[in-house]
Amino acid sequence: MTVEYRTLSLTKHRSSPLSTIPDHVLDSTIDLYFLFCHNQPYAFFHEATFREDFDNGLISEFLVLSILTMSIRFSHEPYFQGRQEQLTTEYALRAWNLVLHECFSSEDGLDYHAVQAATLLAIHDFTGTVTSAHNIEGSRY
């Protein structure tokens, strides 16, 4: 069986956690986001447009990680089993760090994907596992 890996616009680096997730796992976890999280209570995406942009590699790494952070808890994929809490924390921290980098170092201004990701991560932190502020690079409250 051949496992395919999608190359996202910002995930070409081997250091990205997304580089190790098979496409079918990404797809099924995104399905779970739209099934259980989208419109609960916020609708951040037009689903068809999001999926098209995702398939074309136009969704940033931090936004995909934010979506995974929200939806891994609903997954029964063997890839996540026994590591859901660990991976959720890892993905949330990586996403927060990337969002902060995007917000404070981009010369192009703030990207709306950063706002979507930050909001999803804030909801996650508020309602579930709190990502400790001292673990986020450059952030000390």
Task: Place the predicted regions along the sequence by residue.
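Acidic, Ser/Thr/Pro-rich intrinsically disordered transcriptional activation regions
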Residues: M1-Q116, L120-L121, D125-T127
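Classical protein tyrosine phosphatase
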Residues: T131-Y141
